[in-house]
Amino acid sequence: ALLRAGAVIGSREIGMLAACGIAEIPVARRPRVAVLSTGDELVQPGQPLRPAEIYDTNGTIVTAAITENGGEARFLGAIPDDEPQLESAMREALADNDMLVLSGGTSKGAGDVSHRVIARLGSPGIVAHGVALKPGKPLCLAVCDGKPVIILPGFPTSAMFTFHDMIVPVLRRMAGLPPRSDAKVTAKIPVRIASEPGRAEFVMVSLVEGDAGLIAYPSGKGSGAITSFAQADGFLRIDTLADQMPAGTEAEVTLFTPHVRVPDLVIVGSHCTGLDLVTAPLARAGLVVRSIAIGSLGGLAAAKRGECDFAPIHLFDEKTATYNAPYLADGLELVPGWRRMQGIVFRKGDKRFEGMSVQDAVRAALADPACIMVNRNQGAGTRILIDRLLGEARPDGYWNQPRSHNAVAAAVAQHRADWGMTIAPVADAANLGFIPLAEEHYDFALVTARKQRAAVRAFLDALASPEGRAALTQAGFRPA
């Protein structure tokens, strides 16, 4: 046989057919897939954001994923949470396409209407509403007069994992394509990953080279952690009945790309925007730099295990009244970095914070039940400062624990929180109010055994260079 059923037709196959005098062959038509986003709060990328609005991430991602898997994607825009308007748009989409994919409106709240509309669009209607996946539980699957209708969860990571796990196999079958074959590697998990029994859980990971093979660091959990996709190399799956994946487990990692490139320089520890300034010359030189923000304490633990080159830290020792040096273990040495100001961040004009000291501002926030905070992840030096200020108090928002200063500022700027703690350069960049608390030492614990590696030397040179110091100063840091 020249070509078998199911073969993907490319330039090579077309040439073979032409050589045999064959001008036409029957092929599977690319299924037409309509994509609708739902929600009053959605704004298309490129448009300005108003308070309480967010960019429509899912529409863009789902459209691209459909194309990658053999479909002809037709993005029809975002529809408000208005039931008659949404029903009209869904009927029109189903009339002209082979499949309809929506995002949002699948939960059972008063404002989520997509799943209610499906019942009127054709039989048999909804076949599954809610699946044992995390993230992705609210997924809704339906068939309306022979056409698949899928309502993905509104949170981006939930939407993408459920799309690839549940929808891609059906879409590729409709397109006449073979099942997706993702590259996989085995890696060791350096930290315990807690899970929730009863649902299979997907956890995104970043891969680094350890002394005995690949190490897979969790790079962010949560339904809305879209930035984690940019940092992750792939994901692992925790079984439905498991309540954890213990540290040291050898796990199978499904890669997002066909190949993984192990980074030349690995930085694990505290987050700081100054890192981007220092590592920019390395990236321009073609080096792959991986920075994993897990906090100062987590970074120190990684450095002791030999899983990184540098661990950025900012830990104050009350006994010696010094930063960082007392926390070093054998095999680590301190590299001075820069000074940065930590403080309370808030929206300008908020009278609960404007003109106050840090202590008075925190008291005012705790006295107002409507005042919502945004915290930082456990193990972060910033989290230690926050907990010292709060004492035993656990205000609303305390368990919202992003991994970066940028995420804290974004939560406040977008009215998802009223206050948090971040560094002055990030507050300035977001045009937010700022109450200084303390200038801290942001330094690096260097793994001595890796000191002579070319990428390590390049980082040290960039840190000490006049250009690097000038860039840090201009951004609001004070080089050591």
Predicted regions and their residues:
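Short, glycine/charged-enriched hinge/interface segments at domain edges or termini
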Residues: 1-80, 210-221, 235, 250-257
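N-terminal small/polar loop signature for handling phosphorylated ligands or for N-terminal nucleophile
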Residues: 60-122
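Flexible glycine/proline-rich
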Residues: 117-262
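Short loop->beta-strand "edge-of-pocket" segments that line small-molecule binding or catalytic clefts
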Residues: 262-271, 358-383
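N-terminal segment of the mature folded domain
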Residues: 282-360
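Short helices/loops that flank or line small-molecule/ion binding pockets
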Residues: 297-311, 401-417, 425
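A ligand-binding cleft/hinge motif common to bilobed small-molecule-binding domains
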Residues: 312-328, 409-438
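Periplasmic-binding protein-like
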Residues: 332-343, 432-461, 480
